[in-house]
């Protein structure tokens, strides 16, 4: 069994440092209005802007959004094509404003399946915002959590085969350094909209000790009020990371008296 020392307890605050969100419900939102699914995705893009605004206002340092999973390539081709066009137009339209507001944009996932113009826009957005530090916005696109772990494991195996690494050197910390978002704190709060209560292959390694919060609200209707409900719930939780409540209290006392 891993000792508590393997999982250092991060400082706990009312506002999470890193929020990860599965943005679910765009299609159902459109269907309830008897509109094409792409209309729901467009409405969902506006919810992304509201969420970024909220995070900037509250001082959240990292926001990771699940935009398109590796499994989503199996959706109807017309919907995939519409999503790719929406993604491309959103980058053209929004990156300048994100740059002005100090937001750093990153993408995680297998971008090789995207068309060259979209890959170029993604790389350009990363370059133009790389120096920004108010908020790190990571967009998971063509991403899968299992794929992420497998890619990290393969990289470690290649290092062992090349003699750069010994098998006994591989531990949780080393694997953590090879998965996506390795340079960011692990997500403190995970939010999923749309009513489903699962994490759907999103950040499987990174969410090990994350607080989970689910809402029936469909993503296009997600706003500051719902986001504040999530933060209020988060602020009332005790994050123990495998320790006891007494140990957490002792650590808090040590920190405050240091």
UniProtKB/Swiss-Prot annotation:
<dbReference type="GO" id="GO:0009252">
    <property type="term" value="P:peptidoglycan biosynthetic process"/>
</dbReference>
<feature type="binding site">
    <location>
        <begin position="69"/>
        <end position="71"/>
    </location>
    <ligand>
        <name>substrate</name>
    </ligand>
</feature>
<dbReference type="InterPro" id="IPR001441">
    <property type="entry name" value="UPP_synth-like"/>
</dbReference>
<feature type="binding site">
    <location>
        <position position="41"/>
    </location>
    <ligand>
        <name>substrate</name>
    </ligand>
</feature>
<feature type="binding site">
    <location>
        <position position="37"/>
    </location>
    <ligand>
        <name>substrate</name>
    </ligand>
</feature>
<keyword id="KW-0460">Magnesium</keyword>
<feature type="binding site">
    <location>
        <position position="73"/>
    </location>
    <ligand>
        <name>substrate</name>
    </ligand>
</feature>
<comment type="subunit">
    <text>Homodimer.</text>
</comment>
<protein>
    <recommendedName>
        <fullName>Ditrans,polycis-undecaprenyl-diphosphate synthase ((2E,6E)-farnesyl-diphosphate specific)</fullName>
        <ecNumber>2.5.1.31</ecNumber>
    </recommendedName>
</protein>
<comment type="similarity">
    <text>Belongs to the UPP synthase family.</text>
</comment>
<dbReference type="GO" id="GO:0016094">
    <property type="term" value="P:polyprenol biosynthetic process"/>
</dbReference>
<feature type="binding site">
    <location>
        <position position="29"/>
    </location>
    <ligand>
        <name>substrate</name>
    </ligand>
</feature>
<feature type="binding site">
    <location>
        <position position="24"/>
    </location>
    <ligand>
        <name>Mg(2+)</name>
    </ligand>
</feature>
<keyword id="KW-0961">Cell wall biogenesis/degradation</keyword>
<dbReference type="GO" id="GO:0008360">
    <property type="term" value="P:regulation of cell shape"/>
</dbReference>
<keyword id="KW-0479">Metal-binding</keyword>
<feature type="binding site">
    <location>
        <begin position="198"/>
        <end position="200"/>
    </location>
    <ligand>
        <name>substrate</name>
    </ligand>
</feature>
<dbReference type="InterPro" id="IPR036424">
    <property type="entry name" value="UPP_synth-like_sf"/>
</dbReference>
<comment type="function">
    <text>Catalyzes the sequential condensation of isopentenyl diphosphate (IPP) with (2E,6E)-farnesyl diphosphate (E,E-FPP) to yield (2Z,6Z,10Z,14Z,18Z,22Z,26Z,30Z,34E,38E)-undecaprenyl diphosphate (di-trans,octa-cis-UPP). UPP is the precursor of glycosyl carrier lipid in the biosynthesis of bacterial cell wall polysaccharide components such as peptidoglycan and lipopolysaccharide.</text>
</comment>
<keyword id="KW-0808">Transferase</keyword>
<feature type="active site" description="Proton acceptor">
    <location>
        <position position="72"/>
    </location>
</feature>
<feature type="binding site">
    <location>
        <begin position="25"/>
        <end position="28"/>
    </location>
    <ligand>
        <name>substrate</name>
    </ligand>
</feature>
<keyword id="KW-0573">Peptidoglycan synthesis</keyword>
<dbReference type="Pfam" id="PF01255">
    <property type="entry name" value="Prenyltransf"/>
</dbReference>
<feature type="binding site">
    <location>
        <position position="211"/>
    </location>
    <ligand>
        <name>Mg(2+)</name>
    </ligand>
</feature>
<dbReference type="InterPro" id="IPR018520">
    <property type="entry name" value="UPP_synth-like_CS"/>
</dbReference>
<feature type="binding site">
    <location>
        <position position="192"/>
    </location>
    <ligand>
        <name>substrate</name>
    </ligand>
</feature>
<dbReference type="GO" id="GO:0008834">
    <property type="term" value="F:ditrans,polycis-undecaprenyl-diphosphate synthase [(2E,6E)-farnesyl-diphosphate specific] activity"/>
</dbReference>
<dbReference type="GO" id="GO:0071555">
    <property type="term" value="P:cell wall organization"/>
</dbReference>
<dbReference type="GO" id="GO:0005829">
    <property type="term" value="C:cytosol"/>
</dbReference>
<feature type="active site">
    <location>
        <position position="24"/>
    </location>
</feature>
<feature type="binding site">
    <location>
        <position position="75"/>
    </location>
    <ligand>
        <name>substrate</name>
    </ligand>
</feature>
<dbReference type="GO" id="GO:0000287">
    <property type="term" value="F:magnesium ion binding"/>
</dbReference>
<keyword id="KW-0133">Cell shape</keyword>
